Design a protein with these regions (language model features):
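Short helix/turn-capping signatures at newly exposed starts of structured segments
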Residues: 19-109
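Long, charged/polar, surface-exposed segments that mediate recognition or autoinhibition
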Residues: 81-157
Length: 218
């Protein structure tokens, strides 16, 4: 009598696993846009992601937590069970912020992935809305955008050129680190609070870049 329920459960397992994999793939696709949709996807698929990463949530978004995004020793968290996403193994998540003065503010978030940038780019390509915009430069892959009148405009990558305080760039970047790839989004340069509200709902207002007046008062 117990055989039928057991068989039914066994038949359900592959479909459940497939649904979980599809949820992870959907979130990585959202991540590749380098905007707030990544955090909305983490919220929508939080049941799948909580098996792999520490999550915090609010009404509309969720995010993977690190101890301190401003600290080298606290801005990375290892992922449990090596989530299989689009045929790749994600090893850890990082969330970094740096104030480089006249060079600009830099916010990075993303994953360390097992494999080379070539391998990761091949797996990531089908998830990208415009894969041709991801350009190979030496051993890395780069997709660059410039903020212009509240819109993002695709530009040719400018390695070695810092945006400073005069412009804002958004970059999807695949870089080699040994046998692994650092898959990151970044927003950099003249980043202000209004932009972070749009792109990074996980960052609290207390960590927004300060204006010159706010720094002077502080």
């Amino acid at each position: 009598m117990k055989l039928l329920p057991l068989l039914a459960s066994a038949l359900l397992l592959p479909s459940i696993a497939h649904a979980g994999d599809a949820a992870l793939d959907d979130t990585l696709k959202a991540f590749s846009r380098c905007d707030a949709s990544f955090f909305s996807s983490l919220k929508a698929h939080s049941d799948a992601w909580k098996a792999y990463a520490p999550l915090k949530q609010d009404k509309d978004t969720a995010w993977i937590t690190v101890a301190n995004r401003a600290s080298r020793s606290g801005n990375t968290v290892a992922l449990r069970n090596l989530p299989p996403v689009a045929g790749m193994k994600l090893l850890s998540y990082f969330d970094e912020s740096t104030d480089l003065g006249n060079v600009g503010y830099y916010f990075y978030w993303g994953f360390m992935v097992d494999g080379s940038p070539d391998d990761v780019a091949k797996r990531l390509g089908p998830l990208l809305e415009k894969p041709a915009l991801l350009k190979k430069i030496d051993t890395a892959y780069v997709r660059s955008e410039l903020r212009f009148r509240d819109n993002w405009v695709s530009i040719e990558p400018m390695p070695g050129s810092a945006p400073g305080k005069s412009r804002v760039e958004r970059v999807l970047l695949l870089e080699p680190e040994g046998a692994q790839t650092r898959l990151s989004c970044s927003v950099q340069g003249a980043v202000d609070a209004a932009l972070l509200v749009q792109l990074r709902p996980d960052i609290p207002p207390a960590e927004y870049p300060q204006t010159r007046l706010e720094k002077a008062i502080g």
